[in-house]
Amino acid sequence: MDEDTRLSRYLYLTDREHINVDSIKQLCKISDPNACYRCGCTALHEYFYNYRSVNGKYKYRYNGYYQYYSSSDYENYNEYYYDDYDRTGMNSESDSESDNISIKTEYENEYEFYDETQDQSTQHNDL
């Protein structure tokens, strides 16, 4: 079985909402395998994450290259990233407090996180 057929069969059997095989191949070529250790996840991860959505509940954003999941599971990731950034000494002490805040708010405005616990449609009342 050639690679295209195996990948197509896998995607069909896993029922991933008609994922485009050519898109997956392209993302595999352009994604940096080490990116997930540096800044969150690769474009390929985000592609699969988007198709994991149920009736479009998870919001999908494309900015050319992905840095963070838009999920409540990862909503504290930005803060962790910047804390780690500060610990490495990459921010000099001459940086003002307002500079650091503007960096954080730039990402906070760009990414809106979906909190599944606050969505009434996901709540099950099994009493």
Curated annotation (Swiss-Prot):
Chain intervals for the UniProt region annotation (Disordered): 86-127
Origin: domain of life: Viruses
Compositional bias per record (Acidic residues), positions renumbered to this chain: 108-118
Name used for this protein in its record: Protein B20
Organism encoding this protein: Vaccinia virus (strain Copenhagen)
